[in-house]
Regions:
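Long, low-complexity intrinsically disordered regions enriched in small/polar
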Residues: 1-51, 55
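Short amphipathic alpha-helical interface segments
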Residues: 135-181
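Intrinsically disordered, low-complexity segments
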Residues: 363-370
Length: 370
């Protein structure tokens, strides 16, 4: 926006007049203008309210805006979304939902949904999910949202650490943050979420047991690996040397120290690995990170192929993995709940954005939803 400041000119009789003009250029929308737009969008909703409801609605909407705008200010260019008509309509819907609820957590949840709209606004399916989610924030029961968020976290988040114990500790810490209340039993919460279009219940079958699900999605944690002091062990060490890879990429298997394994959650993670080298030049530490070459990736795949696949050994490793899950209090709590969910279900686009927004509210460090 370009705005002209007030102009002033003074001159004596017969003298030349020179006009000074200041041009103020404003790039984008600042906090003040963002709040003005919010106020303009809420004006229509205010007109629909009775005198008795007016004060409560204004207070709630103000709490919502005070949660939203500081979050948007932390994201480069996010306030410019207020110039988008589609975002303004979404703000208007969020105002109606905020005015209808007195749960403080709902204001934070609405904020996270709008932030997600800014960050993933090019995907029409996501936009549709967010729009519907904004409408039902005030309708979803606390325990249903909790269950939705925990089930979403089970399916969405896996650790990246190559260490089995560290990876499970990360999950345990996550569920400590997400399980802010007692998880629901029975099927009422499922019916409730199905009515709100957050899930689609399947009346055929049950969810796979949590420990089995994690064993499948984190296969690098449930391998035996290569037994020490064997021919395959020597072969693996030689392959690492020939490929110029550090021997530290092979670690003791925490579930059986007779074996070593690649420090990976899954074989697919090989393609995302990189090597970091540290050099000291003129007293300064220089750190360089490079992607693995195709040959190095192939070498790690060849080492994976050397793993012991004896069925009885793998069953023993898997049993130890299950034990490590129940040895962590929050994972044990989620496992006991998950394994007793009465029926299988699929989370819809609406449910995913709701669950993600609530999870981010509990743990802001979580990655954004793709």
């Amino acid at each position: 926006m370009i705005r002209k400041a007030k102009q002033s000119q003074k001159a004596g009789d017969g003298s030349n007049q020179y006009q000074a003009e200041t041009i103020i250029v404003q790039n984008g929308i600042d906090e003040k203008r963002a709040r003005e737009i919010c106020n303009e969008m809420f004006a229509a909703t205010r007109r629909e309210l009775s005198e008795e409801a007016y004060d409560a609605a204004c207070r709630r909407v103000n709490e919502f805006e005070n949660d939203l705008i500081p979050k948007m200010q932390k994201i480069d260019g996010a306030l410019d979304a207020f110039a988008d008509p589609a975002f303004q309509f979404l703000i208007a819907d969020a105002h109606k939902t905020a005015a209808s609820t007195d749960r403080p957590a709902d204001y934070s949840l609405l904020s996270e949904l709008l932030i997600h709209r800014i960050q993933r606004g090019q995907n029409r399916a996501t936009i549709a999910g967010i729009s519907r989610a904004v409408e039902i924030v005030d309708e979803i029961a606390d325990v249903a949202l909790l269950a939705l968020s925990v089930s979403f976290a089970v399916e969405q988040y896996n650790p990246t650490s190559g260490s089995i114990f560290q990876g499970l500790d990360v999950l345990d810490s996550l569920f400590e943050k997400l399980c802010y209340a007692e998880l629901p039993s029975g099927s009422m919460w499922l019916d409730h979420l199905d009515i709100l279009d957050a899930i689609r219940m399947s009346h055929f079958g049950k969810l796979k047991k949590l420990e089995e699900y994690y064993a499948e999605t984190m296969p690098g944690y449930c391998v035996a690996g290569i037994k020490k002091d064997t021919e395959n062990y020597a072969k693996a060490q030689q392959l690492l040397v020939e490929a110029g890879l550090p021997s530290t990429i092979m670690v003791n298997n925490e579930l059986d120290n007779q074996y070593v394994r690649l420090a990976l959650v899954s074989r697919e993670r090989i393609s995302s690995l990189s090597l970091t080298s540290v050099r000291i030049i003129d007293g300064q530490t220089i750190q360089t990170t490079t992607k693995l070459t195709a040959d190095q990736e192939k070498t790690l795949g060849d080492i994976w192929n050397l793993y012991d696949n004896d069925a009885s050994t793998l069953e023993r490793i898997k049993a130890q993995f299950y034990h490590e899950i129940i040895n962590r209090p929050n994972l044990r709590k989620v496992q006991a709940w998950w394994n007793n969910v009465p029926t299988a279900f699929n989370t819809t686009a609406v449910g995913k954005v709701l669950a993600h927004a609530n999870a981010k509210r509990c743990d802001p460090s979580l990655p954004d939803l793709n």
